[in-house]
A protein has these predicted regions:
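N-terminal intrinsically disordered/low-complexity leader segments
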Residues: 1-24, 157-158, 208-229
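Generic hydrophobic, amphipathic alpha-helix propensity
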Residues: 24-33, 49, 74-78, 82, ...
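Helix-turn-helix
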Residues: 28, 39-69, 73
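Alpha-helical DNA-contacting segments of helix-turn-helix folds
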Residues: 37, 64, 71-78, 121, ...
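Hydrophobic alpha-helical connector segments
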Residues: 73, 87-116, 170, 193
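Secondary-structure edge/capping motif, primarily at the C-terminal ends of alpha-helices
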Residues: 86-93, 121-125, 177-185
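Short secondary-structure transition hinges
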Residues: 102, 109-147, 157-158, 183
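Amphipathic alpha-helical packing segments from all-alpha helical-bundle domains
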Residues: 129-154, 164-176, 191-194, 198-202
């Protein structure tokens, strides 16, 4: 059989059976990436990940663009579960300090359960031109926590201007504390969460936060997010 006849019959370069579903294939690649990160560590290379998946690097690049794109895809997967879990701490009938503790504890639980993946996501994998707050995991958390703080400041009748600044400052505190704890686990998770809560809540009360809620105070649109008021 000639090459031309094989092409006409559609047998060149295609395995038998139906073509793989693109989304299913993408999820399989993400699973392989997570296995490689957990095995090698947060500095796992695209070559490590391709080897784990049994593929060549060009296939990874075709699906994710580059390592930053892969990190963004992994962050998107975790955000789907982690962000709602953290924000749910503010939907209870507990006092605001307990809400803050619950949110911090939920995040630290993720760090404790998957430390290598956590470090992969926050260690500048976004590329040299991407700032800390522009990384997918950090940026989304920062904006949503800012909404919570803005509602609390508005309820207290004080300036809501610093809400986003304070949100990212809180994130920096918790992320740095988590990083320190991974490297130097000299205290229990409960103690770590208690100390972080004391530090964060002390700053919030000094700033006038009276109540906390994951929802904007006025309807579904947080006007202050664009005006800065």
């Amino acid at each position: 059989m000639t090459l031309a006849s094989r092409r006409r019959r559609g047998r060149v370069g295609r395995p038998p059976g139906p073509a793989p579903d693109p989304e299913q294939r993408r999820q399989e690649l993400l699973e392989a990436a997570l296995r490689a990160i957990r095995r090698v560590g947060p500095n796992a290379s695209m070559e490590d990940i391709a080897g784990e998946a049994g593929l060549t690097k060009p296939i990874l690049y075709a699906n994710f663009g580059d390592k930053a794109g892969l990190a963004a895809a992994i962050a998107e997967r975790y955000l789907g579960d982690l962000l709602p879990a953290v924000l749910s701490a503010f939907e209870t009938d507990a006092d605001p300090r307990t809400m803050v503790r619950g949110a911090i504890d939920t995040f630290i639980g993720f760090v404790e359960g998957d430390p290598k993946v956590y470090r992969f996501l926050v260690r500048g994998v976004g590329g040299a031109d991407m700032s800390f707050i522009e990384q997918r995991l950090i940026g989304e958390f920062g904006l949503r926590i800012a909404q919570v703080l803005r509602t609390g400041l508005r309820a207290a009748g004080v300036d809501t201007g610093p809400a986003e600044l304070w949100s990212f400052a809180i994130l920096g505190t918790v992320l740095s504390g988590a990083e320190w704890w991974i490297v130097r686990p000299t205290m229990s998770r409960a103690d770590l969460v208690d100390y972080l809560t004391a530090f964060v809540w002390g700053g919030l009360t000094a700033g006038g936060v009276a109540t906390l809620s994951p929802r904007p105070a006025f309807g579904g649109q947080d006007a202050d997010a664009t005006t800065g008021n």
